[in-house]
Regions:
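A solvent-exposed, acidic/Ser-Thr-rich amphipathic alpha-helical stretch
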Residues: 27-31, 35-79
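A beta-strand edge to alpha-helix "cap/lid" segment located at domain peripheries
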Residues: 62-68, 75-146
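Short, low-complexity N-terminal intrinsically disordered segments enriched in polar/charged residues
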Residues: 1-28, 32, 144
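Soluble or luminal CAZymes and related metallo-dependent hydrolases
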Residues: 10, 52, 97
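Hydrophobic alpha-helical core bundles mediating ligand binding, dimerization, or RNAP-core interactions
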Residues: 15, 34, 57, 85-87, ...
Length: 146
């Protein structure tokens, strides 16, 4: 299977196709762009290897009743592509939760994604939507960090 070269335009188009109108993501068209040796890291986990990465994507889709992403910006410099996004996750018992973040994709010599690093404020974005945690969390953050 021949895949196209990842550029700002192709990443925007491919990632936009991931989230359908039912809110259940389908990453299968993206998996060919990942190296077998992909290292994925975000604020809560580090995953090594394509099989483990694909399993993590499946778990995330299974846990959410809906999952949507709005791409705000896609920028490329050499072998690094940056995405700025808003991901909205819905769970059965909780309100929709928007996460504001970015992803750094690093391409190897073959043009495959060898590293993906996601940056977001998991706790702040989630605590903002939990009635009893929002006020104490914001008070703590303001007091400790200004």
């Amino acid at each position: 299977m021949t895949i196209e070269i990842l550029t700002e335009e192709s990443v925007r188009r491919l990632w936009s196709k991931t989230y359908n109108t039912l809110g259940k993501p389908d990453w299968t068209h993206l998996f060919p762009y990942y190296s077998p040796n992909i290292v994925f890291q975000d604020t809560i986990q580090r995953i090594e290897g394509k099989e483990a990465f694909m399993a993590m994507c499946g778990r995330m889709a299974h846990r959410c009743s809906s999952l949507n992403m709005d791409l705000l910006n896609v920028i490329q410099k050499d072998n690094v592509i940056m995405l700025e996004w808003i991901m909205t996750m819905s769970f059965t018992k909780y309100p929709s939760t928007p996460l504001y973040g970015s992803s750094r994709l690093t391409l190897n010599e073959e043009g495959l994604i060898i590293e993906q690093r996601d940056y977001y404020d998991l706790w702040g974005d989630i605590f903002n939507n939990i009635p009893y945690f929002k006020r104490p969390y914001r008070k703590f953050v303001t007091k400790k960090f200004g």
